[in-house]
Amino acid sequence: PAVSPDGEKLVYVKQVDHRLSLWLSGIDGKNPHSLVSGGMNLLPSWLPDSNRIVWMNTQPGKKGEAPANHSQIQIINTETGQTRRLFSDPEQITFTDAMPAVSPDGEKIAFVSKRTGTFRIWVSNLDGSDAKPISETNDQDPNLQLPIEQKVPAWSPDGKWIAHWEGVEMIHMSPFTGVKNPQRDQQISATFSVWLVSSDGTKRRKVGRGDDPTWSPDGFVTRAFPDRERGGPKIMIETSSGEKELPIVPHKRNWGRFCWLPE
């Protein structure tokens, strides 16, 4: 889900007839209606005007392939319903791009692209021009001999940092390969981590193990951290006095993505 910058609307993903559609409602959940259907629609991100939304549209691919392999970034005007492919720059329209996140000022977009061989975090102008990778890392995990990918970018409220997931893709784990290998699955999940990179790509640091980074309104990054004793993941947040748990997920429960509501 994603709350509009004016705090009045909520866009979220809803499964309808084995497809994932985008739905729009008031921040209180009233007046829900379908916004986008057809294919798999994920990871909506608002522009600052609180009218336009970009998102990732995915078409079916081969079994075992990552959804981002067949994705494009779309934009919709929620007032008119008009949609189009976001990137108009001629050099960019030939690439497959996914997982968009619009910068707080609406001038830049962070996204995931495989144009250099593996999924990396890229940043460009909103039309796709001046695109460049910003978070360099190793191409392969030395122990597993599998590609290291980067996904799920998230901008800090001040636009200076981008948090993202990094690790070996889940498609190499038993539920996707059909071959049970618990030890290998644990090795793969141990690679899941959240990183921070400056928006210009000059600075980078590891936050810790986990997935699905978000930012609190006051500029602290969160991550979903695996916890066997808890029977499911827990949400950790960095603070000025150290890291602590956000008690928002009940024990022994799975959860979906979450977003912060305006105060």
Predicted regions and their residues:
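Sequence signature of WD/YWTD-type beta-propeller architectures
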Residues: P1-E263
